[in-house]
């Protein structure tokens, strides 16, 4: 806040105090004059109490929402939805699926008409795979050849160290994983499959519906959601719901309009599908060009032998979101590894881009309100992975809402358990991911050493690495005594090689 504004405000307050007769009477009191310090301390204490009360009121903290004081509250009015989600992507539809399964009346308000595209890396990791199996979607994807499980892959470090291995084969040897590390599914396919699964379960899917605004009536405990037909803006539609869920993606338009999110998305990613007439023969490789750190590029194999070339810009480095197009196209021809993988004349689509909100938001709940998925920043700052956290977060949100409805308590104190759930499951990892991301930007030699270590230890070690990067294992794995010291030793070895063996000769991927 501007210091001149503060001084001006304080001057105005002082002026009003000096003019106030009641205040002057207190200041002229004999006790106050004789005990100035005690009076000052009491005044400060009262000020702190008043400020705390105001903050609690603003943040909706403190006393539990009193439902007995809401004269018109009803949990039985069938004209009112139990829950309405703004957005029917993976987060909104997964939430709708689980709530509908429990008999709750849910409206999924989707701006577009399925099938509709979204831009990301298309990599669906383990937690999301479990949910897709439960929804029956995974069987559809496999039966219709719409997803591709990664069988082999690796990464290329900033200095050009690389290793490609068969992590999937190693994961299958370990019964506790019981699924592939990643399956690539195009979002135009995945989102429709998940939304239709929610609809089959009983959720009311409202496509072609743009939400203009939503208002909460505290006297009835009901949201009024004003919408228009996305193709015919003159056609007005109104829905009413007891709980509003913001599931409208990284821009978080609904949550921003309601005052719960105050920042722009802090990352961005590109996507370009490539017809597989290239020399690339792996399922997935991550490239760490030095100029893009802490971001990265990747090439992922999709179903039916198509590739997905993408670049992620993650906050903390020199590059900004505005640099995405420049680096996306530059690496295609100038990076020795990416250009070799794509070949001289790749049949590649025009670059698409999507914003990213990374690291989670501070508060994702309020009275009769939840914020889920990308809108809540459920994207890992180290890997850019978001689909599995969006889906798992919504599964956890359904548990919180089911319990809240059973208790007939939709207060923020009741719905806070949702925040507790996702923080305990994956949110606590986000701060470590951000720290690691910044650390790798400052010390890229760590990635060089890691690639060398994986090359020495083989596919089993790569599988463990993949388990960490896909959320199966916590990132504290890097601190284990059988991992951390080895990376440190490899860093010393990398330094030695650079000093005594000179500049590394660039090798292409085999």
Swiss-Prot record:
Record bears the keyword Transport: no
Cytoplasmic side: 1-36
Stretches of the chain found on the membrane's Extracellular side: 56-510
Organism domain of life: Eukaryota
Topological category with respect to the lipid bilayer: Single-pass membrane protein
GO cellular component, as recorded: membrane
Subcellular compartments: Membrane
Principal location: membrane
Regions that span the bilayer: 37-55
Entry keyword set: Membrane, Receptor, Transmembrane, Transmembrane helix
GO function term, MF aspect, one: FAD binding
Disruption phenotype: Null cells show a 50% decrease of the CMF binding and a loss of CMF-induced G protein-independent gene expression.
Keyword Transmembrane helix listed: yes
Entry-linked Pfam families: FAD_binding_3
InterPro entries membership: FAD-bd, FAD/NAD-bd_sf, Geranylgeranyl_reductase
Known function: Receptor for cmfA, that appears to mediate the G-independent cmfA signal transduction.
Name of protein: Conditioned medium factor receptor 1
Organism this protein belongs to: Dictyostelium discoideum
GN (gene name): cmfB
